[in-house]
Amino acid sequence: YIKAGEPRWRATAHMIADLAGGPILVPATFPLALARELESFRPVLLDAAGAVEGMRAVKTPEEIERIRSVQRVTEAAMERGIALIRTSVPRGGVLHRDGRPLTSEAVRAEMHAYLLAHGCRGTDTIVSCGPDTALPHSPGIGPLREDEPIVIDIYPQDDLSGYHADMTRTVVKGEPTPAIREMYDAVRDAKARGARRRKRRHRRARALLPRDRRCPPGGYGCGDTDRL
């Protein structure tokens, strides 16, 4: 039994060892502290050949349906957030709803409330505006502005299945600048190009990116592509 007051790593290792019932195979990226604690319960083997990663990469039909389920909730939550922006009224360059400025926090709270009501949790949700959108993981703070790009990125997890979805959208209330339109078009075209050339394994998608990590033809940096 797990004892009250056990350190976090040891309690986690204790639980895993009980469930495993025998030797445990771990990937090279497995937390060292947890591996050390596991060794006090079960033999721990390093998966140098990448067998665990290969097993996780191929999803069963049941897993795919769980991912689709959380994705459907994610899409609906995203639409709730975008609807707040769509129905806002610009005043002096700032978006307003119900007589007060519409903020990143308000949009984030609306989406999180929907996610919670449908069995999911949102963490590290991004609702950034204007110059903040140049920072890849800026959460966003304060009033949203007219004619400025608003980046919304949500990464919910289903409370029961543990599976995640991930969705990002860029919207503008008003008229985007030519530079913003150009960047938007470059991303759209790059996505379409990648979809046409996609392969079964995700590592091949990464190989489609140029070695200098520039995304033709717009000449913009690709940003975070490590999770392709």
Whereabouts are the PLM-identified features?
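Active-site neighborhoods and metal-handling regions in enzymes and metal-associated proteins
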Residues: 1-228
